[in-house]
Amino acid sequence: RDLVRSRGLGDVYKRQISDSGKELSRLIQQEAVYIGKAMDELETFRQKPAALRGYCNKLHDIENQADDVYEHFITKLFEEEKDCIELIKIKEIMHELEKTTDVAEQVGKILKNLIIKYA
């Protein structure tokens, strides 16, 4: 902390996390929980594929929610942010969060393929 203050970097950390950023983070946490639950189902998915399929569907639904949050945020960002450098930084951070939800959905697609192949 003293190093940050002594180098005048304190302003770097003054930006508040947007509600959209918090919402994307919350959605990512939900996806992580569902991926964990899906992994627990892998041992028995041949006997009861519906449980695993349900988690895959939840991952898909959450990713769609994340797309909506991201698109709304980006629209608002381009309308309100006047500093081009800040706009680019914030956009990239939010894009990385949104990409994380895409990857979680991809996990769900892979698991659905396992159901089709082995159930």
Model-predicted regions and their roles:
Residues 2-13:
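Single conserved hydrophobic/aromatic residue that forms the stacking wall/gate
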